[in-house]
Amino acid sequence: MMRKIRILSALLTVLMVFGAFGTFMVPTADAAEPVVRAPISDDDQKRMEDMELYLTSPNGQYELYMDAATGNFAYVCVPTGSVSFSTPSVSGRNTSAYKATVLLSYKSRTGYYNNSVTTLNSFDNASELGQVIIKRIKNGVRVEYTLGEEPTVYYIPIVIDKDRFEELILNKITVARDKSIVTVRYNLYDVTGLDPNSEKYKGYVAACPQCVNGPVYMLNSSVEATSSAAKNIAGVLEKYTDYSYEEYQYDTTKHNVEGTVGKTAVFRMALEYKLDDSGLSVSLPGESLAFDADAYTITAVDILPYFDAADKQQSGYAFVPDGSGAIIEFEDALYQGKILTIQNNLYGIDYATHVLKGSTREVFRLPVFGLVKDDAETGAREGFVAIITEGEAMGSITARCEGTSSGKVHAAWATLNPFVTDQYNLNYGANFPITLVSDRRYTGDFTVKFIMLQDEEKIAAAGLTDTYRASYVGMADAYRDYLLDLGVLSDLTTETSIPLFIETFGSVKYDDKILSFPVEIDLPLTTFEDVQSMWQRLHDEAGIDNVSFILTGFANGGIMRQKYPSSLKWTSALGGKSGLKDLVTFAQANSFDIYPNFDFLYSQNRNSSGLSYKHHAGRMIDNRYITKREYNPATQTFSMSNSTGVSITAAAYDELYSKLLKQYSKYEFTAISVMTLGTGLNSDFNDDAPYNRENSKMFTEQVLERMASDYKVLVSGGNSYTLPYASVIVELPTDSSLLLAGSESVPFVGMVLHGYKTATGEILNTAGDTDYAVMKAIENGVGAYFQLSYQNVHHLKDYVYLSQYYAVDFQNWYEEMVEIYNEINNNIGSLQNVLITNHEFLAGTRIVTEEELEAGIDYVTEVDNRIAHVEYGNNTSFILNYNYNFGVKVEYKGMEISIPELCYVKIVEDNGIYVSNFGGDKLITVRYNGTTYTIGAGETVQIY
């Protein structure tokens, strides 16, 4: 079979070279529609000379060529001739790691304070040692690596009598230099004539107990039987002496010592490659990872870290799912002369660990990353998008753009972290952290799917309809199609307005006095009747119908010290059962949804019926209960004493939901809110039943599936595993972390989900800048979300953990809420069922004001960032100027549009161009064909 593959590969190469790259036909698997082969460039063909064809996709569109010696490969799109290589073509010093398909990092388990990490790469530590094996498997190919040099044991004496050592070894070595190789590694222990009570005698005996029977030489403890020092000694003994294995056995037996072989770091693993009609899947099978777990722990395995990497001559960017999405422009790294890196775990903080990181950053909620690059010679733009399809809860994503003089490439990759490691500082007076490692490692598969992104001219030339353009928009299209193929997404029902979600608080425990006696009461913040009043006012006065209410703290004790929802008791002070039933009836009659909100992830009250911390609470590695520790921005730390709940193990969700359902199902609810299940994911290191985050993800999916079979489910954040079950996602990320390493935020999440999921952005009445938040809602296509209560809200400032809700008064916010809602709705209300089809950043010119001109300040007038252009599917688009301090002029479809600072325009193409200004009281000007149009607030003008 291999011979046939080699012949076919050679034939294809000959036909390409002598046929001037003329096209010919490659049959598909079913031979129904042959694929036209496009030429592969000379440079790519040269790199593929040592590779053989191993796999072809069922539709004949993709091929995988592989180098049997290294495991490196070329991933080919047949119709376009595009090739993605597993490793880049680099030269120079210290470049061997770039030739690796795997980077494996590990720590030694010996010594509490051993925190150093060693990294092996598959090129130096496997292929260069001849330790790569390629095997054919069903529908794929498996590449097996042995990372680390297999030990060779050298049999040299460990303890030997002085006379034997001198007679058999030292006296036989005639060259002084060679003799010193031996003598410097052995110490003489002779206690003859020494006082047994002397310190010298005791020291000798402690170091070498055998010396009490006579003088002996002992090998230095630093020399392991597999080390280079042992190799050098063995070489001298072989050259000059007759010291044999039998002599070695005699000495070890006489002196009762064992020839201990030093621990050698050797790791075995495999990558499995498969092709389907959409592209390449690469899997690290958990069963393939083998090593000495008593001696080492694996901290990270980077899978194809330099796949399709760009060199420093290419322009482009790397994409990571930081919040809404972020890109790192290669040019920014080069301009700054730095290495720009964005890296994070999937799904945010794991509170089961003592050391918490990433508190002020947005979460990586979708397991997607990618890279786009321009060919330095042809200008063709190509790249890839990668989706972690298995094991992502144990993974992280990295984008790294090397702009330093020594840097070689720009790349993006996924990493598996099979063990959870944690650090504790035992000495509070000094920084001596110890490392603890979870006993249980992830043993499932870690799989990444790579989908090619193609140059648009190549797509058109090949007549392809099932491939994706090389941009972050193409990445979003590919991921959306992937979710659609899985049945995760479905079209929204027809909506003509954006949703308005109001999360309202029920009650809070309050210290009061009755007849001078101190009592604790349930202080109402919003009653069931108040919810009806809020809906009625919004409906009657503002004409807003698409309203839903999230009821937080209406049961089980309110919003502080709330009991876990393993039981259910509606608060009497809010109207009790009868008030709730009236609200449910009212909601049904007026066709709006109510979502009672329950926290399944954390418990605020140990005295919850049906809940036992002993059986249901999650444990940290040191066996303490997992707590949700709050971040203190003043100290930039987390505190164990500053926690707001104990984490419940995900393994108990299903059991505890069953208890809630017995009572919840008695009411005519159509929906339920479990906000924290969409945003949090913790491990559980309980000794009796430990679970990693991948296990917790599975348990969360199971309970969400049950909930979704009975109710519409609302979650917060929208971690990817909730997408099949969540009807509504609030606080969907609409911005990135705005890290210094990032070049731009992009609405990747919005592009994927718009038209398929009902979603809102951040809480608008607590946003740092409402205008900015509104623009982000328009750019991402999300609805409005407010946290508001109806009465007694001034008391919230008296509570440390509730003082953040300083602006939740419904009456105070009513007019501004209606204004904000109408602004977003006027812009995108009619677009709820269409896709976001394109997004880009426009170049513009800074508008220098008269005051700035008079000040004589020299301004950079060219602006090439913070001007976003987003297009929706029905010929509607927006240009948004996110610059805070100045307006900009942009050219668009023959128009010169002047947009003030932190403002935007809406453009509709419908038998002409219509420009609208729905962004407040600032004026928009448009110049076209010598005519200037001024567009006031709320106005729409036809330009042509």
Regions found by a protein language model. Name each.
Residues V488-L489, E495, A542-S548, A589-D593, ...:
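Loop/turn elements at helix/coil->beta-strand transitions in domains of secreted/extracellular proteins
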